[in-house]
Amino acid sequence: MFNYERPKHFIQPQNPCGSRLQPPGPEVSGFPSQTKQSSIVIQPRQCTEQRFSASSTVSSHITVSSSAYPAPQQLAGPNPGQKVTATYNQSPASFLSSILPSQPDYCNSKIPSTVDSNYQQSSVNQPVNAMSSQAANARPTPKTPDHEIQGSKEALIQDLERKLKCKDTLLHNGNQRLTYEEKMARRLLGPQNAAAVFQAQNSDVQDSPQHNPEQARLHVPTSQVRSRSSSRAEANDQDAIQEKFYPPRFIQVPENMSIEEGRFCRMDFKVSGLPAPDVSWYLNGRPVQSDELHKMIVSEKGFHSLIFEVVRASDAGPYACVARNRAGEATFTVQLDVLAKEHKRAPMFIFKPQSKKVFEGETVKLECQISAIPPPKLFWKRNNEMVQFNTDRISLYHDNAGRVTLLIKDVNKKDAGWYTVSAVNEAGVTTCNTRLDVTARPIQTLPAPKQLRVRPTFSKYLALNGRGLDVKQAFNPEGEFQRLAAQSGLYESEEL
């Protein structure tokens, strides 16, 4: 538990008449003539500003001298007393550490900006012999009042709080937090250079304080504080980034190509370099110019393309791609072969198939002749349905002259309809339609003969008188009847 009582060795025995700080001069009190002097070093960087009350600790008879800051003047009294030449660049923590052996030395506190109002400023350059003339008028120091003792307690508490705050500035990993100046130094000089600068400053600060136990005198080294503008200028000079260059390098290149004449062609590649290289194309040593048929495209991340809208025979040859920048150049070569365009002709009917009408059971042929380069593919449809070839009844024949024959055996009524023939090749398509009608075969019948009636007497007299036939022949009815029947095609009636 913390004890707020004032340490006994911290409170010096006082004169019953009280003590007052006097202007610089020789001591008249009964203290030893030899005065102790303490040394304090002021760091260029201060972390926190603390208030300091000079009346809390000045009662100890210590003579402190400094050449960098003015000393307090004497109080408004006729009797000059003790000689106190104080330097106010000393923090409360440093002052307590000089008195209390157990207290650590703090070097990161600021110079107290104010002192007790009972003191007045005096010139530092005041001669020492002028101070000795006031030694005879020194009065005995009065007793320190209680409010001054209470102020010293508050200073001690503030010193302990400052110690706790310094511990709080450490991070969890044990690294100390960077101040604004350290951050700026790291940004301008880099982390390694900044660390080296601060280590050099810390080593100089640790070596600079010199404490003489015999004289106990304060030596304050005057260090020139570097201004922010000059530090930035030096950092900019040291941290100047030198521009770097990298020669071109092809990461991706196209392979040799063979393209048919009239087709589209594209060559893609990727190149890197710093700064970005300029790309040029050459065909047989002559630069390739961008026009309607040749285009050069540059995309992001170093991708380039050479495009041929329509490949011509004159585009064939070795292409050299050259990439240049300040650091150098790189080259690759690709071969482009252009194949001659084949002569093509769309299919054309020399003669078309004719419509036909056949009887059931007959064999029919649908013939046509087609001319095309290259030879076309043929498709036959019946009523918009594909015709199945290579069956027992239906077959397709064609020759090199372009004659095409669709043969249908044993035609039936199912084979009737509209037939469409299509010829297709790379150059085009042609079609033609024809009609096939199938009818039933008719049945042939003979008409019935007409019957005639003939009298036999007539035939007898005719035979005797007209032709002079034999009596026997004249009276032979069967022979006459057969003759008449053969001439007229008549048959003998059953009624006779």
UniProtKB/Swiss-Prot annotation:
SMART domains referenced in this protein's UniProt entry, alphabetically: IG (SM00409), IGc2 (SM00408)
PANTHER family xref list: BASIGIN RELATED, MYOTILIN
Chain's role: Component of a complex of multiple actin cross-linking proteins. Involved in the control of myofibril assembly and stability at the Z lines in muscle cells.
Region (Necessary for interaction with ACTA1) location: 213-496
Region of interest (Disordered), ranges: 1-37, 202-239
Residues that bear Omega-N-methylarginine: R20
GO molecular function: actin binding; alpha-actinin binding
CC per GO annotation: cytoskeleton; sarcolemma; Z disc
Protein name: Myotilin
SUPFAM superfamilies tied to this protein: Immunoglobulin
Start and end residues of each stretch annotated as Necessary for interaction with FLNC: 213-491
Main subcellular localisation: membrane
Keywords assigned: Actin-binding, Cell membrane, Cytoplasm, Cytoskeleton, Immunoglobulin domain, Membrane, Methylation, Muscle protein, Repeat
Keyword check for Membrane: yes
Organism the protein comes from: Mus musculus (Mouse)
Subcellular location field: Cell membrane, Sarcolemma; Cytoplasm, Cytoskeleton; Cytoplasm, Myofibril, Sarcomere, Z line
Protein family according to the UniProt entry: Belongs to the myotilin/palladin family.
Domain Ig-like C2-type: 248-333, 347-439
Phenotype of null mutants: No visible phenotype. Mutant mice develop normally, have a normal life span, and their muscle capacity does not significantly differ from wild-type animals, even after prolonged physical stress.
